[in-house]
UniProtKB/Swiss-Prot annotation:
Organism: Clostridium botulinum (strain Loch Maree / Type A3)
A Pfam family it matches: DNA_mis_repair
PROSITE patterns for this protein: DNA_MISMATCH_REPAIR_1
Function: This protein is involved in the repair of mismatches in DNA. It is required for dam-dependent methyl-directed DNA mismatch repair. May act as a 'molecular matchmaker', a protein that promotes the formation of a stable complex between two or more DNA-binding proteins in an ATP-dependent manner without itself being part of a final effector complex.
UniProt GO molecular function: ATP binding; ATP hydrolysis activity; ATP-dependent DNA damage sensor activity; mismatched DNA binding
Biological processes per GO annotation: mismatch repair
SUPFAM superfamilies: ATPase domain of HSP90 chaperone/DNA topoisomerase II/histidine kinase, DNA mismatch repair protein MutL, Ribosomal protein S5 domain 2-like
Name of the protein in its database record: DNA mismatch repair protein MutL
The keyword DNA damage appears for this protein: yes
Similarity comment text for this entry: Belongs to the DNA mismatch repair MutL/HexB family.
GO cellular component: mismatch repair complex
């Protein structure tokens, strides 16, 4: 074994500098943070050759006392803390006392500083960690520090520096983050004698965002905030139209400190998930104010990462705040269209006590997926229904709060609300003698017949009692213009033109419906006339075994059929007529790409998303009744504005928008 050597101070300082000072932008970051901690309100940064030749920081902060000038450049000399306990109560940007010692050991450094209580300041010059002189000087209150010839005495580090253009870009980026974090401070970046960035310290975050980005982005922001006992989350998120293909426009600040956090980024992006298209990343500037004892900032040499005491609670707080803000913005955009006061509903809260429960059964109606039988996606072409006895025997449900549904009634878990339409008259006139059989084949797309609901007191009656709709104001001022290209539905309402993507809209309806069935535990399955046998690889079979309960709860009946072979006997009824093998393998592939620790909710959502393949397609010609039914289904949803993949389900043009297009108005 080699002899153990004690390194001299110069060597240890250079090694430490390698951890703290990676590139010129690291110097700018450390020195500007010192200026902020000193209470500066105006900070000027001058650079030459990307900071490799010169970095100069001028601030109007409190300055450094003459007696402390020399000590400021000693390793681990700081005015921020006295003991290790202070780290967990720290509210300043810096605290380790490493920056000045590290910077001065690998550069030529000159510092001038004066405090308000002195008529003169002090100037110190250090070259390669050695003090060349210390003298009195005249200067303004505050501090000016010049760092030149960075890494001049560390050739190994010098040759790995990037181009001056690249380093200038990195410095601009970190200055922009400071502008966002501190809207009340004026920052001025001068590159090669020319002003590059200028902020005015107005204290308005939106002004800072406009300064850093542009007018378009500043005009497409959504404000959000959430305040809890120990944490406040607030800031701005961008509307979907300003999303980008990279994460460069994302900023996270914890107690005003710019940090990078995968889990905070994930919380925001998950909140955006159903509002953005695939591979698009949202714009956001998010601030997290939290008591210092609940975070640890001493986990990275550059303090660019933090640890939270309770990441789960943090994730939920951020997710909820962002998600509600997005939903609120979209809801406001379509207020006139989705005015649910216009929808006539029957609130059955008073009759909840009259309901009883049934045990869940499986659907016993086999459906041949290869036949030409078609199910009307909106359930309008079924002439006759099975008897009450048959319904109770054949349809598996968990709730026995039964009303005839025919895909036109909806129930809310919290406050049972039944939605009815003009089929009510027909249903009320039916008695069980008419329910002998279904004479017509089921039409295309009724892939999700809802559970039927009967009133407890009428299950033995010869008719089904349904609360009758006396009026429905929703359609009074709504005009269905028709379809464009058999893909987009055109609707006029309240002097506004709505264009609905029929595929995206129906996709969202099916997604929410299937997801709701999974959550409530009564997914209706269909028995396949010919079970589908699939031979899996060992890896695929292991993924299936790991997620077999997910498949079961989603309406799939799957049995092992050999060492790595499975036999699919039932699939969710909502899927209609899928290619069972392809669908199953698609779901398996999605589950494979998820982490094993992903929650079951995320996995169910993935399955529900794939289930949307049975939605109506572009170029499908819809009747007016079908269009109305699709709109009714959308009205029930909490978030009908985007499909499961993040595409918009509709867009709106006001009369003013159209008149501007035709140059009728300015």
């Amino acid at each position: 074994m080699r002899k153990i050597n004690l390194l001299d101070l110069e060597t240890t300082n250079k090694i430490a500098a390698g951890e703290v000072i990676e590139r010129p932008f690291s110097v700018v970051k450390e020195l500007v943070e010192n200026s902020i901690d000193a209470g500066a309100k105006n900070i000027t940064i001058e650079i030459e050759d990307g900071g490799q030749k010169l970095i100069k920081i001028i601030d109007d902060g409190e300055g450094i006392y003459p007696i402390d000038i020399k000590n400021a450049f000693l390793p681990h000399a700081t005015s921020k803390i006295n003991s290790i306990e202070d780290i967990y109560k720290i509210s300043t940007m810096g605290f380790r006392g490493e920056a000045l010692a590290s910077i001065s050991s690998v550069s030529k450094t000159k510092l001038k500083s004066r405090v308000d209580s002195y008529n003169f300041g002090k100037e110190i010059y250090i070259e390669g960690g050695k003090i060349e002189y210390l003298k009195d000087t005249g200067c303004n209150v505050g501090t000016t520090i010049e760092v030149s010839d960075l890494f001049y005495n560390v050739p190994a580090r010098l040759k790995f520096l990037k181009s001056a253009r690249s380093d200038s870009s990195s410095i601009s980026d970190i200055v922009n983050r400071f502008i966002l974090a501190h809207p009340d401070i004026s920052f001025n970046l001068i590159n090669k004698g020319k002003q590059s960035i200028k902020s005015y310290g107005t204290g308005n975050l939106k002004d800072s965002i406009r300064c850093v980005y542009n007018k378009t982005i500043s005009e497409n922001l959504i404000n959000f905030e959430s305040h809890k006992d120990i944490i406040s989350v607030y800031g701005f998120i961008g509307k979907p139209e300003i999303s980008r293909k990279s994460r460069t426009n994302q900023s996270i600040f914890v107690n005003k400190r710019y940090v990078k956090s995968k889990f905070i980024t994930a919380a925001v992006e998950n909140a955006f998930k159903s509002f953005l298209t695939v591979n698009s990343y949202p714009f956001f500037v998010i601030f997290i104010d939290i008591f210092p004892e609940y975070i640890d900032v001493n986990v990275h040499p550059t303090k660019s990462e933090v640890k939270f005491k309770d990441e789960r609670a943090m994730f939920k707080t951020i997710f909820d705040a962002v998600h509600e803000a997005i939903k609120g913005e979209l809801k406001e955009s379509f207020t006139n269209f989705f005015n649910k006061e216009d929808i006539n509903i029957y609130d059955s809260e008073k009759s909840i006590a009259e309901t009883i429960k049934l045990e869940k059964e499986e659907v016993q109606i086999p459906i041949d997926l290869n036949s030409n039988n078609k199910i009307d996606i909106f359930g309008n072409n079924i002439n006759k229904l099975p008897t009450n006895t048959e319904v109770l025997k054949n349809i598996g449900i968990k709730e026995k709060n039964i009303l005839e549904n025919n895909d036109n009634f909806y129930t809310s878990k919290q406050n049972e609300i039944y939605y009815t339409n003009k089929n009510d008259e027909y249903l009320n006139s039916c008695n069980k003698d008419d329910y002998s059989k279904i004479e017509k084949p089921l039409q295309k797309g009724n892939k999700n017949p809802d559970a039927l609901y009967l009133n407890e007191h009428n299950t033995n009656s010869s008719s089904i009692n349904i609360k009758e709709n006396k009026s429905n104001n929703f359609y009074v001022d709504m005009k269905i213009i028709g379809q464009f290209n058999n893909t987009y539905i055109l609707i006029e309402k309240d002097k506004e033109l709505y264009i609905i993507d029929q595929h995206a809209a129906h996709e969202k309806v099916l997604f929410e419906k299937f997801k709701s069935e999974i959550e409530k535990g009564y997914v209706i399955s269909q028995i396949l006339l010919s079970p589908v046998v699939i031979e899996l690889s060992e890896d695929e079979f292991n993924i299936y075994e790991e997620n077999k309960d997910i498949f079961k709860n989603s309406g799939f009946a799957v049995e092992n059929f050999g060492e790595s072979t499975i036999n699919i006997k039932e699939v969710p009824l909502i899927l209609g007529k899928p290619n069972v093998e392809n669908l199953f393998m698609d779901i398996l592939y999605n589950l494979k790409n998820m982490k094993s620790k992903e929650t079951s909710t995320i996995k169910y959502n993935a399955i529900a998303t794939l289930a949307c393949k049975s939605a109506v397609k572009a170029n499908d010609n819809l009747k007016e009744e079908e269009i109305k039914k699709l709109i009714e289904d959308m009205l029930i949803l909490n978030n009908p504005y985007t499909c499961p993949h993040g595409r918009p389900t509709m867009i709106k043009f006001t009369l003013k928008d159209l008149e501007k297009k035709f140059k009728r108005i300015q």
